Amino acid sequence: MGHCFSLPSSQSEIHEDNEHGDGNVVCYGEEFGLDQDLPVHRLGSVCSIQGTKVLNQDHAVLYQGYGTRDTELCGVFDGHGKNGHMVSKMVRNRLPSVLLALKEELNQESNVCEEEASKWEKACFTAFRLIDRELNLQVFNCSFSGSTGVVAITQGDDLVIANLGDSRAVLGTMTEDGEIKAVQLTSDLTPDVPSEAERIRMCKGRVFAMKTEPSSQRVWLPNQNIPGLAMSRAFGDFRLKDHGVIAVPEISQHRITSKDQFLVLATDGVWDMLSNDEVVSLIWSSGKKQASAAKMVAEAAEAAWKKRLKYTKVDDITVICLFLQNKEQPS
C-alpha cells in the first residue's frame, strides 16, 4: 500500500489533522494568481509505501507557500517501537505549526539585519525541543517508541536542514562537467558515530551491536538489554533520554545555486537499499518528472528490498523530492 502526492494543491492553511493525505502523507499548497514578477513555488512530490509490518510507521509532509509565498517545508519522520506510528504522526502534524509560530515570533523580535536562514535555524532548535516535550505528555506511551525527523525549509535561495536520527537529505547538483552528483546534506545520527556513542556512554547508556547484526551499533539501558535503539537522536524514546539519546537536531544551511537541481528527503527504507548516487541518478535520468519522482524512487527501493531479501522483509519507504529550479509558472 502506498500514498503518493504531488504539488501544487489548493490549500493554504496549516492543519493538524489528516484531511490532506490518507494517513501517512499530507500535502499543502497555495494558488495565489499573483503577478508574474513575484516568486513562484518550487514543484515537489511525495510518496510513502508500507513495508511488511502491520502498520506503516513513516509519515511525511510537503508544504508549499509555508508562511510566505516563496517558502517550502518538507519533512519525513520514521517511527519505531510499539507506538512509533503515533509518534511520527504527531510530530508530522504538530511541527509545521509550532515551527512557523516560532519563526514569526523571531521576525517580530529579532534584529532586522538577522538573516532569514539564521532565524529558521533558531526556530528549529526550539520547535524540536517543544515537540519532544509535548510527546512526553501524550496518552500513548513513548518510553520505548520514537521517531526520526529530517526537515528542510527553503526560502528563496536559502535552504535549512534540521535532522534527528537516520533519515537523510541529499542534494542533486550539477558538476562543472555537466554531470549530476549527489551531495549528502545530513549525517546519519546513530551510535556508529564515535561522538554520538561517547555522549551516550557518558550518560551511562550502553552501545554495542547484536551478534546477528555485528555492523550496526545500538543503544541499550545501563542494566537491561533493551531497547537496542539504532539511532542516537530521536523524538520520544524517553527511557533513553537520561542516557544520552537526545532530541537536539543537527542543523545546516546551504545557499541554493543554479547548479542545485533537486532535494531528496527519505527514510532509511530508501537509503538501506539505494545509495545517494543511485537515487540522484534515477531522478535525473527519468527526465526530471517532478510529479512522479518520489514514487519512482520509492518503487525502486521497494523492488530492491524484495530482490535482496526474497520478499521476507520490506521496510517502510517514504520519499520527498523537491525540484529547486523548475518552478510552477503562474497562470
UniProtKB/Swiss-Prot annotation:
Enzyme Commission no: 3.1.3.16
**Occurrences of domain PPM-type phosphatase (ranges):** 43-324
Which residues does UniProt assign to the signal peptide?
none
Query: Could you tell me what reaction this enzyme catalyses?
Result: O-phospho-L-seryl-[protein] + H2O = L-seryl-[protein] + phosphate; O-phospho-L-threonyl-[protein] + H2O = L-threonyl-[protein] + phosphate
Q: Listed GO molecular functions?
A: metal ion binding; protein serine/threonine phosphatase activity
Give the main EC class. hydrolase
Domain of life of the native organism = Eukaryota
Q: Where does Mn(2+) 1 bind?
A: D78, G79
Tell me which PROSITE patterns the record gives.
PPM_2
Instruction: Name the keywords, alphabetized.
Output: Hydrolase, Magnesium, Manganese, Metal-binding, Protein phosphatase
The answer to whether UniProt assigns keyword Manganese to this entry is yes
Per its record, how is this protein called by name?
Probable protein phosphatase 2C 72
Q: Which organism is it from?
A: Arabidopsis thaliana
Lineage in the entry? Eukaryota, Viridiplantae, Streptophyta, Embryophyta, Tracheophyta
